[in-house]
């Protein structure tokens, strides 16, 4: 992916799909009114993206409207404990923490450099006491975290955001459900993938598409949750996420 910058937000341009300029024009217009530079969290969020780029991280964070949507979801649910699988530079976790002053977030990141940058960004934003970054493979760390939930060392989560390798997406989702409280929400990012989710060539040859389909199909059979996939046309081009609510 390549990226360009506008006055209000970071624009993600996909090489796999032709964007309509109205998509990001609408985001720029709405963000200028609903998330203007005068907001208290604007400077720290901008600094997070800036430092992440400066330190060489990929420009693949959740786009600003999606990150704020998740922060508002946590507000709606009165969430006190959240889980994130895939920290990158900490942008989403910082956004959520900035709008939820009582929330505590556990975030898992496999890449040591990304985790280091995320910790820098989190400290710069002043949330180091509320966002914990665990470094390692989620498939290894989630069972340890689940054990802590079951023995009472860790509170159950009211919100989970999964934005990591898609081939293990279902496994991450399964662990998230096991660690969630009733009526918790779980979001799995990047499942639509510019429509590749239903394109035969990608179904056969793309491990990310196969992983996303496995997640969607298994969630559909899972009596513990109810779920929907929402397609998005926005700054990050054409994609979508799965959102589930734990019964």
Curated annotation (Swiss-Prot):
Cofactor note: Binds 1 divalent metal cation per subunit.
Single annotated GO MF: metal ion binding
Binding positions for substrate per the UniProt entry: 163
InterPro entries the record matches: Cation-dep_OMT, SAM-dependent_MTases_sf, SAM_O-MeTrfase
Binding site residues for a divalent metal cation: 163, 189-190
Enzyme Commission designation: 2.1.1.-
Coiled-coil positions: none
Pathway: Secondary metabolite biosynthesis
Required cofactor names: a divalent metal cation
Keyword vocabulary terms for this entry: Metal-binding, Methyltransferase, S-adenosyl-L-methionine, Transferase
Induction remark: Expression is down-regulated by ralstonins, lipopeptides produced by the plant pathogenic bacteria Ralstonia solanacearum. Expression is positively regulated by the imizoquins cluster-specific transcription regulator imqK.
PROSITE patterns attached to this UniProt entry: SAM_OMT_I (PS51682)
CDD domains documented for this protein: AdoMet_MTases
GO biological process: methylation
Gene3D superfamilies on file: Vaccinia Virus protein VP39 (3.40.50.150)
Binding site for S-adenosyl-L-methionine: 84, 86-87, 138
Complex and partners: Homodimer.
Biological function: O-methyltransferase; part of the gene cluster that mediates the biosynthesis of imizoquins A to D, tripeptide-derived alkaloids that serve a protective role against oxidative stress that are essential for normal germination. ImqB is a canonical three-module NRPS that assembles the tripeptide backbone of the imizoquins via condensation of Trp, Tyr, and Leu-derived precursors. N-methylation by imqF and phenol oxidation by imqC, followed by cyclization via the FAD-dependent oxidase imqH carry out the three-step transformation of L-tyrosine into tetrahydroisoquinoline.
Family (UniProt): Belongs to the class I-like SAM-binding methyltransferase superfamily. Cation-dependent O-methyltransferase family. CCoAMT subfamily.
Protein name, as recorded: O-methyltransferase imqG
């Amino acid at each position: 992916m390549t990226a360009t910058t506008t006055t209000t937000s970071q624009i993600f341009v996909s090489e796999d799909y032709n964007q309509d300029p109205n998509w990001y024009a609408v985001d720029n217009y709405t963000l200028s009114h609903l998330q203007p530079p005068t907001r208290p969290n604007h400077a720290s969020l901008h600094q997070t993206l800036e430092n992440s780029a400066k330190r060489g991280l990929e420009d693949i964070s959740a786009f600003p409207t999606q990150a704020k949507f998740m922060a508002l979801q946590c507000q709606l649910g009165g969430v006190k404990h959240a889980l994130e699988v895939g920290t990158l530079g900490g942008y989403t976790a910082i956004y959520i923490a900035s709008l939820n002053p009582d929330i505590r977030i556990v975030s898992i990141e496999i890449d040591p450099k990304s985790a280091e940058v995320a910790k820098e960004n989190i400290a710069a934003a002043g949330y180091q006491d509320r966002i914990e970054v665990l470094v390692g493979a989620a498939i290894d760390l989630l069972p340890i975290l689940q054990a802590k939930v079951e023995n009472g060392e860790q509170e159950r989560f009211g919100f989970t955001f999964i934005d990591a390798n898609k081939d293990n997406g279902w496994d991450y989702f399964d662990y998230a459900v096991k660690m969630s409280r009733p009526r918790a929400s779980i979001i799995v990012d990047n499942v639509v993938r510019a429509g590749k989710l239903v394109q035969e060539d990608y179904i056969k040859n793309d491990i990310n598409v196969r992983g996303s389909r496995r997640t969607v199909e298994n969630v559909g059979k899972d009596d513990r949750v109810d779920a929907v996939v929402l397609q998005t046309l926005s700054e990050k081009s054409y994609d979508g996420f799965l959102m589930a609510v734990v019964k």
